[in-house]
C-alpha cells in the first residue's frame, strides 16, 4: 500500500487541507484500482463546456472523428449549432459546418453531456475582475463540480485563460472532497491544462494549423512553499495523468491538417506560464510598434521605412508590426 499523509484542521467551522503532517492516513492499493478503463481511442466521447471561440473551434475540430457534445447556457447558441449555423464569426467554422459531416451536437444539459464523456474540455469564460484584480474562475469550478458529481472518472482539460498556478491550486482545493466524500472514495482527480493560441475569427484555422500543442499535467515542484500542493497531488492525482495528456494531444493532432506539429508535455504551472508570457510578448510587440509610430509622427519621420528596416533583422521579423489602435480581444488584455 502507498500511504498519503494528509493534515486536516478545522478553521472557523470549516475543514481545511493544510499539508502533509499526518493525523489522517489514507491507503491506496498500489495496483491502481482507481484508474478507469477509457474507451478505445477511436470511440472516445468528448464534452466541451462553452461555445465561444475556444470551445466551438475545439468542438468542431474533434467532432471530425469523435462524438462531441458542446454545452452552453444560451439556448440560441445551442439551437444554431444544432442547425449548423455558427453563433460566432469564424470563416473555417462556417465552412466546416456547411461542408463536413461532423459528429457534433449541442445541449443545455451539461449533466447529461458530462455523464458519458471520456474527456471534458473546459472552455468556460474567465473574465478579468477589476475589483478583485483577478480572473473570475467560478465558471470553471462550476463545470468541475458538476463533472465530479456525475462522472468523476472523466479527464478534464482546462482550455480557458487562467492565472499561473491555478490548476495546481485546484488539486489542493478538491483534496478533501476526494479523501472524505464516500462517492469519490477510490477515485482520482483527473485534471489537465492545455493552453490555446488562437486568434479571434481564425480559431478553427489555428487549431487545424497549430503552431504547437502543449498539455500540462500534475508534476511535483521542489520547494517547501509547494508542499501542500504536492501533497494534494500525491493524495488525489492520477499516476496515469501523463498518459491522459498524451491522449489529449493525440486528439488535437488527429483533427489538425498540419503534419509534424511540435508537441510539448510539461507541468501544469509551466503550461500556464507559456500562455501568459506568449500573450505578454505579443501585447508588448504591438505596444512597441505603436510607440515607434508615435515617435516617428512627432519627429516627422516615415514610420513604415523605419519598421521595414527593423523588421529585416531576422531576430525581429516582419510580422506583427503594423501600428494600430493597440491590442485587444479576450486574452491579451487579461494576460498583460
Regions inferred by a protein language model and the residue ranges of each:
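Structural/interface elements that position substrates and couple domains in central-metabolism enzymes
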Residues: 34-336
Amino acid at each position: 500500500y502507498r500511504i498519503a499523509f494528509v493534515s486536516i484542521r478545522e478553521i472557523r467551522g470549516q475543514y481545511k487541507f493544510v499539508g502533509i503532517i499526518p493525523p489522517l492516513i489514507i491507503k491506496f492499493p498500489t495496483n491502481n484500482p482507481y484508474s478507469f478503463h477509457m474507451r478505445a481511442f477511436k470511440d472516445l466521447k468528448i464534452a466541451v463546456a462553452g461555445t465561444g471561440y475556444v470551445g466551438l473551434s475545439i468542438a468542431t475540430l474533434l467532432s471530425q472523428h469523435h462524438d462531441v457534445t458542446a454545452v452552453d447556457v444560451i439556448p440560441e447558441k445551442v439551437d444554431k449549432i444544432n442547425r449548423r449555423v455558427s453563433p460566432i464569426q469564424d470563416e473555417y467554422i462556417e465552412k466546416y459546418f456547411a461542408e463536413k459531416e461532423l459528429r457534433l451536437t449541442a445541449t443545455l444539459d451539461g449533466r447529461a453531456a458530462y455523464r458519458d464523456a471520456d474527456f471534458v474540455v473546459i472552455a468556460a469564460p474567465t473574465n478579468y475582475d477589476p475589483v478583485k484584480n483577478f480572473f473570475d474562475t467560478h465558471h470553471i469550478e462550476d463545470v468541475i463540480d458538476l463533472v465530479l458529481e456525475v462522472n468523476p472518472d472523466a479527464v478534464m482539460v482546462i482550455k480557458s485563460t487562467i492565472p499561473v498556478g491555478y490548476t495546481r491550486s485546484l488539486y489542493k482545493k478538491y483534496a478533501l472532497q476526494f479523501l472524505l466524500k464516500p462517492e469519490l472514495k477510490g477515485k482520482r482527480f483527473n485534471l489537465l491544462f492545455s493552453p490555446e493560441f488562437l486568434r479571434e475569427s481564425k480559431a478553427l484555422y489555428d487549431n487545424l494549423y497549430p503552431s504547437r500543442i502543449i498539455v500540462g499535467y500534475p508534476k511535483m515542484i521542489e520547494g517547501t512553499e509547494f508542499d501542500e500542493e504536492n501533497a494534494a497531488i500525491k493524495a488525489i492525482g492520477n499516476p496515469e495523468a501523463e498518459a491522459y495528456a498524451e491522449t489529449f494531444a493525440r486528439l488535437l493532432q488527429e483533427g489538425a491538417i498540419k503534419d509534424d506539429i511540435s508537441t510539448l508535455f510539461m507541468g501544469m504551472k509551466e503550461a500556464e506560464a507559456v500562455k501568459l508570457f506568449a500573450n505578454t510578448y505579443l501585447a508588448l510587440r504591438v505596444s512597441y510598434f505603436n510607440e515607434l509610430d508615435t515617435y516617428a509622427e512627432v519627429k516627422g519621420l516615415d514610420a513604415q521605412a523605419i519598421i521595414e528596416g527593423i523588421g529585416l533583422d531576422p531576430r525581429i521579423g516582419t510580422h506583427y508590426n503594423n501600428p494600430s489602435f493597440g491590442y485587444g480581444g479576450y486574452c491579451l488584455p487579461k494576460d498583460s
